[in-house]
UniProtKB/Swiss-Prot annotation:
Tissues expressing the protein: Selectively expressed on hematopoietic progenitor cells and vascular endothelium.
Name of the molecule in the record: Hematopoietic progenitor cell antigen CD34
Organism field: Canis lupus familiaris
Topology, Extracellular side: 34-294
Keyword Membrane attached: yes
Signal sequence, start to end: 1-33
Protein purpose: Possible adhesion molecule with a role in early hematopoiesis by mediating the attachment of stem cells to the bone marrow extracellular matrix or directly to stromal cells. Could act as a scaffold for the attachment of lineage specific glycans, allowing stem cells to bind to lectins expressed by stromal cells or other marrow components. Presents carbohydrate ligands to selectins.
Residues carrying Phosphotyrosine: Y333, Y343
Ranges where the record places region Disordered: 325-389
Chain's gene name: CD34
Cytoplasmic topology ranges: 316-389
Gene Ontology cellular-component terms listed: apical plasma membrane; basal plasma membrane; cytoplasm; external side of plasma membrane; glomerular endothelium fenestra; intercellular bridge; lysosome; perinuclear region of cytoplasm
Length: 389
């Protein structure tokens, strides 16, 4: 019998321990909190509702409008459903980037259930954003007291940085000047104003343009800020035919010449880098050379003109000539006798001979160059006969 009782006592012991363990596992206060989150997407509005549904006397609903205004409605009602107080609180926010719901615990035998409905619509914006945190907490209380549910709205601003590149003003906009160099022959240039650019070594206009066009236009096309603007700056260069080291910068007038000289003096260091050692104001016509054929033709023409002029001068200083090569108007008799000085009234001459000489002198002085004839004979023959006599 004792053995049978001991066997029964041994069989019932595990049941007692099991019951004792079950009793020890039961807590004095039972709390069960269940959170249900139901996401719903509506493209036109944003709503956040939080409600505590079982054995609670206070429920809150939070609504976020898309325009950036958050409205909190606090509704207090008793267990029978009668509304006691309605209060409204408005908080302005720009947008919602984060929503956190943190339920707390309460040492009570009342079981509460919280449901949250979230409606989110995405709208791109370039403004500053803020982070909104909703923290509903259940404070501990007695089992007989209604549970107190509080929701705190915490807004933490988030800085939004936007890097904007500065927009340049109209005055700060750099001027765009396109420069170009044109090469021409010095004989084809019709202008007279020019500046001779002395190069360190002999170079043609095309070679100089190929190597230094951009840099030279930057120096000579510089303008004041008030005159700056989009345009084209054209420079005309001509190769000198007299001086191989000289490139002529041809200019239109004195005003442009004075302006370019100032720029060249201002940028002398830059000119040396371009191979220009010096610059002087010179006339374009002085750098034109004539060809050898042209020079020969000019010299020949000058010599012929000189010969013709000399010949004409000597001809103008002499009278007309006779066929025998003697000057007309002079009698050979006068030439032989000293121009008519041989007639004298010497003591050995008879008066008849003097009369004949005076008679013969008249025809010789008549200006015809020949004496009058008598009986078909010239006066010269009679004079010879008289002289012989």
């Amino acid at each position: 019998m004792l053995a049978g009782r001991g066997a029964r006592a041994g069989g019932g012991l595990p049941r007692g321990w099991t019951a004792l363990c079950l009793l020890s596992l039961l807590p004095f206060g039972f709390t069960n909190t269940e959170t249900v989150i139901t996401p719903t997407t509506v493209p036109t509005s944003t709503e956040i509702m939080s409600a505590v549904s079982e054995n609670t006397s206070k429920r809150e609903a939070i609504t976020l409008t898309p325009s950036g205004t958050t409205t909190l409605y606090s509704v207090s009602q008793d267990s029978s459903g009668t509304t006691a107080t309605i209060s409204e609180t408005t908080v302005h926010v720009t947008s919602t980037s984060e929503i956190t719901l943190t339920p707390g615990t309460m040492n009570s035998s009342v079981q509460s259930q919280t449901s949250l409905a979230i409606t989110v619509s995405f709208t791109p914006t370039n403004f500053s954003t803020s982070s909104v945190t909703l923290e509903p907490s259940l404070l501990p209380g007695n089992g007989s007291d209604p549970p107190y549910n509080s929701t705190s709205l915490v807004t933490s601003p988030t800085e939004y940085y936007t890097s904007l590149s500065p927009t340049p003003s109209r005055n700060d906009t750099p001027s765009t000047i396109k420069g170009e160099i044109k090469c021409s022959g010095v004989k084809e240039v019709k202008l007279n104003q020019g500046i001779c650019l002395e190069l360190n070594e002999t170079s043609s206009c095309e070679d100089f343009k190929k190597d230094n066009e951009e840099k030279l236009t930057q120096v000579l096309c510089e303008k004041e800020p008030a005159e700056a603007g989009a345009g084209v700056c054209s420079l005309l260069l001509a190769q000198s035919e007299v001086r191989p080291h000289c490139l002529l910068l041809v200019l239109a007038n004195k005003t442009e010449l004075f302006s370019k000289l100032q720029l060249l003096r201002k940028h002398q260091s830059d000119l040396k880098k371009l191979g220009i050692r010096d610059f002087t104001e010179q006339d374009v016509g002085s750098h034109q050379s004539y060809s050898r054929k042209t020079l020969i033709a000019l010299v020949t023409s000058g010599i012929l003109l000189a010969v013709l002029g000399t010949t004409g001068y000597f001809l103008m200083n002499r009278r007309s000539w006779s066929p025998t090569g003697e000057r007309l108007g002079e009698d050979p008799y006068y030439t032989e006798n000293g121009g008519g000085q041989g007639y004298s009234s010497g003591p050995g001459v008879s008066p008849e001979a003097q009369g004949k000489a005076s008679v013969n002198r008249g025809p010789q002085e008549n200006g015809t160059g020949q004496a009058t004839s008598r009986n078909g004979h010239s006066a010269r023959q009679h004079m010879v006969a008289d002289t012989e006599l």
